[in-house]
Amino acid sequence: MIKVGSKNVQLSNISVMLIDPDKELSTLIRSVLKSLGFSTIHVARDGTAALNILHAHNVDLIITDWMMSPMDGINFVQKVRRDKDSPNPMVPVIMLTAQAKRWNVEYARDTGMTEFMVKPFTAKQLCAKITRVIESPRTFIVSPQYIGPDRRRKTEPYDADSGERRCVHDEAAIAKYSKDKLHLGQKEHEVFLVDRDFSLKEKIGKSVNLDDIFSEANVRLAQKIIYEAKGDFLHWFANDLKQLEESHHHFTEHHETQAAKMQMAQASLRIKGRAGTFGYNLASQVADALHDVIVQLHGEHDKIAQVIRKHMDAMYVILQQDIAGDGGDIGTALIASLGDLTKKYLH
């Protein structure tokens, strides 16, 4: 609970569920949320476990990663939005992931995600997303093709000639519903527009200004928790590189391509998110470039293995020399050389 002036602001009235396979990072995010005033925080490692929690507990806000198994964040959101036995199909979902390509954002949006946030992250960015969910909820759409918050944030009228991907049919049956009257088993072709849900705002108090709760001082305290965990990062980094080494060995020596690809992709995204969050921007950039190489995988197997190895060697140097920040001119040259190598060997 954070004190604002003479008031006790009850962010503890909002129940949060955090879904992330990264145990260390999810523990850190949980600590940040606690410092901001949230007290009920359920934690799950994948979508399957999260669904069990959602059915057993009241959850007001979900923060989820994308890459998880056996059920990833996208499939989880689909089930929350579309399953007829979903306990809360309108629950706000913030996707916090290292998957940062444009198509990732669009795909998550079209699945029914409420807000999208990229790892690495700061406490200030997290507060901004939470504020948007609470203060500016959107009309909820229920249709045969899509269930989720209105994807159109524009306030001006729809213009059919603008190239906007919205399909409007005069014959479509559009009805306005309130949240308590929403049913997912609507008839074919019916479109329901559900009124904006301000229940989270009501839980903390309609007169409360979130800018006061997430003040510069309070956000600074939350960010301090992240800074204090920075000392653990190099240990986590070393463990991630060890996993990359093992997966690369299987990829190179045993040609266990699919399993090794998945493991290396997960490790590279984990490094990207962790490294950038703790100020190791060069390591984050190299890990991001490595992930691109892994998921593209166009070229001869041995050449792909060589390019992956060069990216790993670069990260070993960053770890051994404890290179924080972007590495200056050396970092710029390193990123450029890895890019040139990738273009040379892969297509």
Regions found by a protein language model. Give the residues of each.
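CheY-like receiver
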Residues: V9, E135-L210
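Two-component/phosphorelay signaling modules centered on CheY-like receiver
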Residues: K23-R45
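Alpha4 helix (beta4-alpha4-beta5 surface) of REC/receiver domains from two-component response regulators
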Residues: R30-S31, N75, P89, A100-E115, ...
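Helix N-cap/capping motif at the beta->alpha junctions
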Residues: V43-N52, G73
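Active-site beta3 strand of CheY-like receiver
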Residues: H57-T64
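Receiver (REC) domain active-site loop signature in two-component systems and cognate sites
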Residues: M68
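C-terminal output helix
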Residues: F121-I134, V142
